[in-house]
Design a protein with these regions (language model features):
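Mixed-charge (Asp/Glu-Lys/Arg
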Residues: 1-72, 77-294
Length: 294
């Protein structure tokens, strides 16, 4: 099976994104436009191509992609124009389907797959999924094992079913299940419990040396924070000339370099103890992932 994400924002027809999304929810479908003039509904690919291939000079690549790759039981993330997230379980693969309502309202959604769709609270959406919505491409795979297993677990949880078998064995360690942003958030929360207040404006993508800066309300000291995951190394020597002390966290202890003068390593066991003591109030996505690996 595969995990995908799709933007519902048709450019043709009425090009009303809100109306198109509401239509998809009501009909239990997700998809794209590339409509034919005859609007002949069909599940036979060759019939669709015979007409659409002429209209669009063969440039129907996204429809071909959906036809080839989307199958029953795949999972698809989507997002409405107001920023709400949804997770969909595919019921059946590609078909050309334009309802009477779509024709009357000129809703440019016709190359579709039927699915069951559940709204997901933003607190339950993994950072990897959110990041995948930044590119403008309409439809793409989310090729991430953690996101796949979490999405299966989340579907089972929200639908109150056991539809998917979740591979817990590959993620027995919570830090293998958390993505980069979730691990940063965890350290963010830990430091605040230790009396360090994070400076929100310092949390920028172009801050190369630090993930964010923190300040002590009692002493006024400012410190940097760096977090890496997986097999990515943290080089302590990069901070030898830093004007700040720097907190470092790498859950797999991938530290290199000899500088110890102004770096403070947050030990893995310290973070595990923090998780255990704080799991009742940690972000729900982290709570879900703790349940997933239990």
């Amino acid at each position: 099976m595969y995990l995908f994400r799709i933007h519902i924002r048709p450019q043709g027809g009425a090009a009303d994104n809100k109306e198109a999304f509401a239509y998809c929810l009501k009909e239990g479908i997700l998809g794209v436009g590339w409509r034919t003039k005859s609007h002949k509904n069909t599940t036979v690919w060759e019939e669709y191509v015979a007409e659409a291939g002429v209209i669009y000079n063969g440039a129907i690549d996204i429809c071909k992609y959906i036809k080839k790759w989307v199958s029953k039981d795949d999972l698809v993330w989507t997002r409405d124009p107001d920023g709400n997230y949804y997770l969909a379980k595919v019921i059946s693969g590609w078909e050309y389907w334009a309802s009477e309502e779509a024709r009357e309202k000129d809703i440019d959604i016709a190359n579709v797959f039927k699915c069951e769709i559940i709204k997901v609270d933003i607190d339950d959406v993994p950072g990897k999924v959110v990041a995948c919505f930044r590119p403008p491409r309409t439809f793409q795979e989310i090729a991430d094992k953690r996101a796949m297993e979490y999405s299966k677990f989340l579907w089972n949880t929200l639908s109150k079913t056991k539809h998917y078998d979740v591979d817990k064995a590959s993620f027995a360690d919570i830090f293998t299940m958390l993505d980069d942003e979730e691990t940063e958030d965890l350290v963010f929360l830990y430091l605040q419990t230790q009396g360090w207040f994070v400076l929100p404006n310092s949390r920028k993508a172009d801050t190369m040396s630090f993930e964010y800066l923190c300040v002590s309300p009692t002493t006024g000291e400012v410190v940097g924070t760096q977090v890496k995951t997986g097999g990515s190394n943290i080089d302590k020597d990069l901070y030898a000339s830093s004007s700040y002390r720097v907190f470092l966290f790498q859950p797999n202890n991938c530290y290199v370099g000899t500088n110890d003068s102004n770096v403070v390593i947050i030990e893995r066991d310290v973070m595990l103890d923090f998780i255990e003591k704080s799991k009742g109030w940690l972000p729900r996505i982290i709570q879900y992932k703790l349940r997933l690996i239990a």
